[in-house]
Structures are given as structure tokens and as C-alpha cells.
Design a protein with these regions (language model features):
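Iron-sulfur (Fe-S) cluster-binding modules
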Residues: 29, 37, 225, 231-235
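Alpha-helix boundary/capping detector
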Residues: 141-142, 150, 208-209, 232-235
């Protein structure tokens, strides 16, 4: 993978996908700025771990507070809503996952674009992938391209000729493939948090835990997060 002698901003949640994307960005760009968004999500431990991962990699991290709890409704934000226990029970009557946060990725990309534009950075990296979450409308290639077009039209890029590029290195990959890619890049997943219930110790029951657990089993290896928790006596 050739090094791009430019900077990039990465939308970094601290989850497994964005951790893989962070390692990819470190190999691809000369400097990486991690934008970590606290949007009043239930799994706020993710932002704490995200800052730890960024520190471990000597990546400049920026924690952005942008609460969505008074704007949107989602089981990932509203603690009174029940987190689904399986993929089969994870959708509402309209077929939309109850863990979908309305237009979250659109909001985050807008924040990232403003953040990047202010620093004259024209690359944005995301950990979006579609195969494991096909019913999330804001993770598709079409959505990402439309957002890229909107950013290029609605920022100074339309005047200066500088062009924003949104990178989606995980699009089209399964969770197993994402983990394998990360391991090849030297990724440490021991601090990556995926559980929807908002605890460092995963429940191993929610859809996110289920997908992650199955992926590591397919690779015949223990989840590095579980390994770390065992060593620390937390599990």
C-alpha cells in the first residue's frame, strides 16, 4: 500500500470496523487526525476506548460532543428502549433496525467535512461496511458518494477546486474479512468495543456482539478483547 503524502481525518468510534480503518489510514496517509464523536450513545465506553487506541497509535484525537438524544430516537441512545437480543429481533415493523440512528453517518460526515475543511484536509476515512448491516441506509456506497458530492458542492472546495474524497476501505467486506485485513495491518483489537449495551465487558447476546463473536470463531481465534479482559481478571 503506497503512502499518500497528505493528511486525513477519520471518523473513529473505537469499534472493530473503525479500528481496522484507522490502521489502514495510518499506512495510507502521512498524518491521521481521529474525530471521535460523543453523540449521547448508550455505549459511551466506546469513546473512552477510542481515545486509548488513538493514544496507543500516537494518533491525534479530537473528542467532539454532539448530543443527538433530543433530536433522534434510537435504541442506541434511548436507554429505555430494549436492545435486541438477536439479529432476528433487531428490526421494527418497517424493517429498519431499531439500533439505526437516523442519518447518523450523514451528520458525522458533515461534522468531519467541516472539521477537515477548517484544517485544509481533503481526505475523510470511514469504517462503513454494508455486508454485516445491509439495512442501514447510511452505510452504502451510493449514500457515501452522494455525501461526497454534497460536501464538494457545499464547501469551499467548490470555489478553490480542492476535492474532498471519502474513503471506505471496508465497503463490501464481511466482518471476518475486516478482521483479517486488520490483523494483516497489525491491528490490536483488545480495546475495540462493539457491544450495544454500553459496557466494556461484552454481553455476547446483542446483534453486534453476535456478528463479532462469529467472525472471530470463523478465524479460529479468541477475540483479543476477551483475552485482555481475562488477563485483567474482568471476565
Amino acid at each position: 500500500m503506497g503512502m499518500n503524502n497528505e493528511k486525513t481525518v477519520i471518523l473513529f468510534s473505537g469499534g472493530l470496523d473503525s479500528t481496522t480503518a484507522l490502521y489502514w489510514a495510518k499506512k495510507k496517509f502521512s498524518a491521521v487526525l481521529a474525530m471521535i464523536v460523543n453523540y449521547s450513545q448508550r455505549h459511551s465506553i466506546e469513546t473512552e476506548m477510542a481515545q486509548q487506541v488513538a493514544k496507543n497509535l500516537d494518533v491525534e484525537a479530537h473528542l467532539i460532543s454532539f448530543p443527538l438524544k433530543n433530536i433522534v430516537y434510537s435504541a442506541l441512545i434511548d436507554k429505555d428502549k430494549k436492545i435486541p437480543g438477536s439479529l432476528e429481533t433487531s428490526k421494527n415493523a418497517e424493517g429498519v433496525p431499531i439500533t439505526y440512528v437516523p442519518f447518523r453517518n450523514g451528520i458525522f460526515l458533515s461534522l468531519a467535512a467541516a472539521f477537515a475543511e477548517s484544517r485544509k484536509i481533503y481526505h475523510i476515512v470511514t469504517g462503513f461496511n454494508l455486508i454485516d448491516s445491509p439495512d442501514y441506509p447510511d452505510t452504502t456506497e451510493t449514500f457515501t458518494k452522494k455525501m461526497e458530492d454534497a460536501i464538494n458542492q457545499g464547501t469551499s472546495a467548490s470555489i478553490t477546486g480542492n476535492t474532498f474524497k471519502i474513503h471506505t476501505p471496508l465497503i463490501g467486506k464481511s466482518k471476518k474479512e475486516i478482521i483479517r485485513m486488520g490483523l494483516e495491518l497489525g491491528a490490536d483489537y483488545s480495546y475495540s468495543i462493539s457491544c450495544y449495551r454500553g459496557k466494556e465487558i461484552p454481553c455476547l447476546k446483542c446483534p453486534s456482539c453476535d456478528i463479532r463473536d462469529n467472525a472471530f470463531k470463523q478465524l479460529n481465534m479468541e477475540d483479543p478483547l476477551i483475552t485482555r479482559l481475562k488477563k485483567e481478571g474482568k471476565r
